[in-house]
Structure formats: C-alpha cells, structure tokens
A protein has these predicted regions:
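Residue(s) in the substrate-gating loop at a strand-loop-helix junction
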Residues: 112
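Catalytic Tyr-x(3-8)-Lys segment
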Residues: 171-193
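Active-site loop immediately N-terminal to the catalytic Tyr-X3-Lys motif
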Residues: 70, 117-123, 145-146, 204
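Substrate-binding pocket helix/loop in short-chain dehydrogenase/reductase
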Residues: 68-69, 76-81, 178
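Short, small/polar-rich loop/turn modules that mediate ligand/substrate recognition or access, typified
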Residues: 144, 149, 209-211
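Short C-terminal tail/terminal secondary-structure segment
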Residues: 117, 181, 199, 210-223
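Active-site helix of classical SDR
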Residues: 92, 128, 136
Length: 223
C-alpha cells in the first residue's frame, strides 16, 4: 500500500496511483502542503485512518532553483530549506510515536550529490541537501534503538521535472558538458535508476544499515 502526497501535481500523483494499482498494488493520493507542520500531522492522521499503519516514509518532496549567492533572497533560501530539509525532520518526528507503538519503521530520505559535494550557483539547495545528509545520520543515531532505520539516497543528475529547463532545446552545450562529468559518459540518469536502491533500503535486507547515504550518480562523484 502506497500513499502518494501531492500539493499542486494532482494529475502526476494520480498517474503514480494508477501505475501502482495496475501492477496489483494499492495506492491513494493525498493532498497536503508539507512545508507546514499542521499539514504533515493531518496527512499522517489521514493515512493512518485509511490503512492503520505506516511502515516506510520516503521523503522525496523537493525544490531546486539555480540561483547564485548574490541573487539568493530570503524567500528563495527559506523555500528550499523548508521543503528540502525542515519538512523531512517534522515528517519523521510526527511518525516516531506510531513507530514506537508498532516496534519500528523505516525512513528513506532523498538527498543529492549536491549534499555530499557542492556546486556553484545553488547555495540554498546545497545547504538543504547537505543538511539532509547529516540529519539522516543524526536521526539514525537517536532512533536506531527504537528499531527505526534511517538512510538516504544521493542521486546524481536525474531527469525529472526539477531540471527539465536545462534538458530541452538550446541546452546542447550543457548536456555535452554533463556527459564529460561521469566516467560512464551518461548525462542524465533515469528515475528508474534509483528504484533498486530504494527497494533495498525499504527491505529487511538493509536492517543493519543505519545513517548511510548511498550515492547513485553514474560515477560522477569518483572524480
């Protein structure tokens, strides 16, 4: 059973629901603004009311903006830190009492290689994703004794709606550059390239892995 959260992208959320149900699973979409703690708490209540249990939380909501230091406003900074980092913490905090009752749970945070390294022209994004890497470690250190398993994935350059603006016509030079940055010569990874790692972290096979960030970037970070 999968609860799919959305705020504005209802059609995309419903597409995910249909994909899951067509494969024989159970899924439902839930609208909530997870930049607001009351919405996180209400969403959690709705999912628990619907299905009675939450075993795994995937913190995958996020925002990415290419903005250099001198153009980063307070609003841009707060937007990225709130959605990419703050919401992840309060989602976990909201679910901890439930996991204590049922004997454990799992958290998979979606960070970025911008959190394990750094890039120019996106200081707020790097700060938010770097914070998520260390939040993963801090949560694991505190919650491991509760049988709450917390890890994260740091994707490389994955083709998503967040970076569609740099993958279209007119960006040939950028795309060519991306191919030189990995030993594999891959410019953009597919979303499906993340699924194996996510399924592993969601499974019991990862029960002895706590506080780790697994990089999936086609080899970008080896250079």
């Amino acid at each position: 059973k999968v609860a799919v959260n959305y705020l504005k992208s209802e059609n995309s959320a419903n597409d995910v629901v249909r994909e899951i149900t067509s494969a024989g699973g159970t899924a439902k979409s839930f609208k909530a603004d997870i930049s607001k703690v009351p919405d996180i708490e209400q969403l959690t209540k709705e999912v628990l009311h619907e299905w009675g249990n939450v075993d795994i939380l995937v913190n995958n909501a996020g925002v990415f903006r290419t903005v250099p230091v001198m153009e980063t406003t307070e609003e841009i900074w707060d937007e990225q830190l709130t959605l990419n980092l703050r919401s992840c913490f309060f989602f976990v905090k909201t679910l901890v009492p439930h996991w204590q009752e049922i004997g454990g749970g799992k958290v998979i945070n979606i960070s970025s290689i911008a959190g394990t390294g750094a890039f120019p022209n996106c200081p707020a994004y790097c700060a938010s994703k770097g914070g998520l890497v260390n939040l993963t470690r801090a949560l694991a250190a505190e919650l491991g004794k509760e049988n709450i398993n917390v890890n994260s994935i740091a994707p490389g350059n994955v083709a998503t709606a967040l970076n569609a603006h740099v993958r279209g016509p007119g960006n040939e030079e950028y795309i060519a550059l991306m191919k030189t940055l990995t030993p594999t010569g891959i410019d953009f990874l597919d979303v499906e390239d993340m699924t194996g790692t996510a399924v592993f972290l969601a499974s019991d096979d990862s029960r002895m892995i706590h506080g780790e960030t697994i990089v999936v970037d086609a080899g970008w970070s080896v250079w």
